[in-house]
C-alpha cells in the first residue's frame, strides 16, 4: 500500500525529488577539471536524467485518459466499480513505444506496480512463474501499469527492476501525477483490475494475489 499498514492474519499484503611559472600547471589542470564537470552536467541535463535505458521519463511522458474514471476502491467486497466500463488509457511503455489499455481490448487483467513497493517486488515473480508454468487463458490479455515512479525511492528505475525479473508483460508507464492510477480508482500496491469481454469491471483487488486466485479470476473472464 502506498501508506504502510499493519498486516493482520488473513489480510492481503500490500504497500498504500592566472599566475605564471610553476604555479600555472596546477591552475590549468584545475580549470580543465572544472570544464569537464560543467560539460558532464550539461550532457546530463540534455538527457533529462534518464538512466533507465529506455524508460519513458514520468515527468515528460503524458498519460491520456478518456471515459469515466472508476470510483475509488474503498471496500473490495462491495466495489461500486463492478459493472462500470473501463476508461481508456494511452501512453508509452517501458521502452517508449505507444501502448493503450481500454474497454475494447476484450477480457483483460491489469496489474498495478510501484517499483519501491516490497509487496510488488514479491508479486512480480509470482506472475512471471505463472506465465511460464500455466500461461494466460486464450483470449485474455495481461497488461501492467508502472505507477508512482519516484527516482528518490528504492529500486529505481522500474524498467531495470522488471528486466531483472524477466518481466515480459506490456507495461504502461504512468506520468508524474499518477493519472493512470487515479483513473482506475486505485491507491494501494500491488493492485489488480479484471475486465470482461464487454469492457466492464468484474473485480478489483489490492495486495499480493496468490497464483491460484489469479488463475481463477482470469479463467472466469476468458471468452
PLM features: residue spans?
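N-terminal targeting signals for export/organelle localization
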Residues: 1-85
Amino acid at each position: 500500500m502506498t501508506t504502510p499498514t499493519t498486516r493482520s492474519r488473513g489480510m492481503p499484503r500490500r504497500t498504500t525529488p592566472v599566475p605564471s611559472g610553476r604555479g600555472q600547471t596546477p591552475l590549468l589542470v584545475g580549470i580543465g577539471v572544472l570544464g569537464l564537470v560543467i560539460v558532464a552536467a550539461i550532457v546530463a541535463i540534455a538527457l533529462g536524467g534518464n538512466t533507465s535505458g529506455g524508460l519513458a521519463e514520468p515527468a515528460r511522458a503524458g498519460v491520456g485518459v478518456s471515459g469515466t474514471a472508476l470510483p475509488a476502491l474503498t471496500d473490495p467486497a462491495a466495489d461500486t466499480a463492478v459493472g462500470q466500463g473501463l476508461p481508456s488509457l494511452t501512453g508509452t511503455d517501458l521502452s517508449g513505444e505507444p501502448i493503450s489499455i481500454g474497454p475494447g481490448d476484450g477480457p483483460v487483467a491489469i496489474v498495478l506496480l510501484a517499483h519501491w513497493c516490497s509487496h510488488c517486488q514479491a508479486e512480480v515473480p509470482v506472475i512471471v512463474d505463472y506465465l511460464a508454468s500455466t500461461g494466460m487463458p486464450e483470449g485474455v490479455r495481461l497488461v501492467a501499469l508502472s505507477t508512482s515512479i519516484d527516482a528518490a525511492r528504492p529500486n529505481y528505475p522500474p524498467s531495470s527492476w522488471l528486466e531483472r525479473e524477466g518481466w515480459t508483460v506490456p507495461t504502461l508507464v504512468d506520468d508524474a501525477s499518477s493519472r493512470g492510477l487515479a483513473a482506475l480508482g486505485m491507491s494501494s500496491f500491488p493492485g489488480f483490475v479484471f475486465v470482461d469481454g464487454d469492457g466492464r469491471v468484474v473485480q478489483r483487488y489490492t495486495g499480493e494475489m496468490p497464483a491460484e486466485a489469479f488463475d481463477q479470476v482470469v479463467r472466469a473472464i476468458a471468452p
